[in-house]
Amino acid sequence: DKNIDIPTSETIWSIKGNKKLTENSPIKLSWTNDQGITFEKEISLDDKYLFSIKQRVINKTSGKYDFYSYGQIIRNEIPDIIDFLILHEGLIATLDDELIEEDYDDIQEKKFARTAQKGWLGISDKYWITSLIPPQNKEFKTTFDYKDKFRANFIATEPLELGPNNSIEENLQIIVAAKRVDVIDGYAKSLAIDKFDLVIDWGFLYFITKPLFFGIDYFFKLLGNYGLAIIAITICIRLVFFPLANFSRSEEHTSELQSPCNL
């Protein structure tokens, strides 16, 4: 709400209670503006890469205010990029089931903006992803732009109404993770994040490359050697297609036998 002071990047927060963030001990931050409205954040961390932020606004005044959920990731400059066809490094999102990949130079030329009901957004490196997961099933607008810095952000299109002597609460999740399949798929499943597995660059033949990866990974864990794992998955593929190849050869042989009869 433009009529009140809200926290900024320069706000000095007070820490309530525990001062060290660990997987077993969240930290709580608090700040009260001159109008008497208190903003609270509780930041917790799991045993891997997930930051959960519970945001609360407490209104002890007689006024009524509207607040919009908001989150932003900033990259100060373009990193060293590997120019590889199937590897995307830049701004990324899935919005209502559609994968969005924007290169840094594209965003410098033109801003990207779209509204959606579900999805996630972030900035992708070769081995790492930093991502925001907005509150789901609530319409939000995602924007990728460049103003001296690369910015990936979202803002809710509908406000949360805060009445007199009342409070509101909203949750935001941030994942700063290595692009490991077990980690990414684990968060996609446990947090019900739509198409979060597309964080990993599977290429255009996603429906083939991902099952092949799981097959090779299975045999690697079983045999302890990637060379043997590749041989094993190759044998499995040949066994799957053997009946089809055998049928094709039988048909060809039958055709050769029929040719003299036709003469």
Give, region by region, the residue ranges found by the protein language model.
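Single conserved hydrophobic/aromatic residue that forms the stacking wall/gate
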Residues: 252-263
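Pre-Walker A segment
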Residues: 243, 247-251
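Interfacial loop/helix-cap signal at membrane boundaries in integral membrane proteins
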Residues: 4-8, 175-229
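Soluble non-transmembrane domains of integral membrane proteins
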Residues: 1-194
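Hydrophobic alpha-helix feature that most strongly marks membrane-spanning transmembrane helices
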Residues: 135, 220, 224, 241-244
